[in-house]
Amino acid sequence: MVKGPGLYTDIGKKARDLLYKDYHSDKKFTISTYSPTGVAITSSGTKKGELFLGDVNTQLKNKNITTDIKVDTNSNLFTTITVNEPAPGVKAILSFKVPEQTSGKVELQYLHEYAGISSSVGLKANPIVNFSSVIGTNALAFGADISFDTKLGELTKSNAAVNFVKDDLIGSLTLNEKGDLLSASYYHAINPLSNTAVGVDISHRFSTKENTFTLGTQHALDPLTTVKGRVTNSGKASALIQHEWRPKSLITISSEVDTKAIEKSAKIGLSLALKP
């Protein structure tokens, strides 16, 4: 595995995972099974109010080729074919959705010790072309992410970022939405043994002069149980507890309250993931 600055999508990922991953207000159930031939089948269902959504995902691996096929309750078929290392540091990804004939996309990723590059293009007459790159090291890296609409003949996305890593600290600064949104994130691993960490995500929108922030923390009560909490500038406070009750099988309970409308009921989410 190549060690380097990673891809553009990796910038700020540690802070995002701490602040947003596993928080939900729905009821979700996931079960995975594995055959002796290496085929993995994952079935999941999510209850959103009175609406129930479900999907079945089948994953097949053959040497360095992985095929994922997912069918949802709307009879949509999503297929992703990933080829790992057709050349050193390269990953090729083909994805498409049936019945949408213009949903196909090809993506190439390249990881180097001092660079990470990703490029994708839609498989249609006038596709959107996306290109992102990160240049630097594990400690300091600079990145850019742009999209070009060949039909309109103009840039539809232009983002830039810088990422800094120092021991147990990770900081990132991003400029998104064509320079309108400035965001900064910070992640600090306080105690790796207990998985204790804090994170913050702050944003400023120049067009509206609006500021937002999310502050969160996590801590492992024991090797199998983790608790997390976060607050936002809008007054919403969330907490979750996640327990690995058997190897690779997780139960997660999360809640959210609006401190500015405390009379309202808290939102409760439950997630159960079963793996053999």
Swiss-Prot record:
Record's keyword annotation contains Glycoprotein: no
Keyword annotations of the record: Ion transport, Membrane, Plastid, Plastid outer membrane, Porin, Transmembrane, Transmembrane beta strand, Transport
UniProt subcellular location: Plastid outer membrane
Any matching Pfam family: Porin_3
Cellular component terms (Gene Ontology): mitochondrial outer membrane; plastid outer membrane; pore complex
GO molecular function, a single term: voltage-gated monoatomic anion channel activity
Predominant subcellular localization, coarse grouping: plastid
Domain of life: Eukaryota
Coiled coil: none
Alphabetical list of InterPro entries matching this protein: Porin_dom_sf, Porin_Euk, Porin_Euk/Tom40
Known role: Forms a channel through the cell membrane that allows diffusion of small hydrophilic molecules. The channel adopts an open conformation at low or zero membrane potential and a closed conformation at potentials above 30-40 mV. The open state has a weak anion selectivity whereas the closed state is cation-selective.
Domain writeup: Consists mainly of membrane-spanning sided beta-sheets.
Family: Belongs to the eukaryotic mitochondrial porin (TC 1.B.8.1) family.
Protein name per the record: Outer plastidial membrane protein porin
Gene name of the encoded protein: POR1
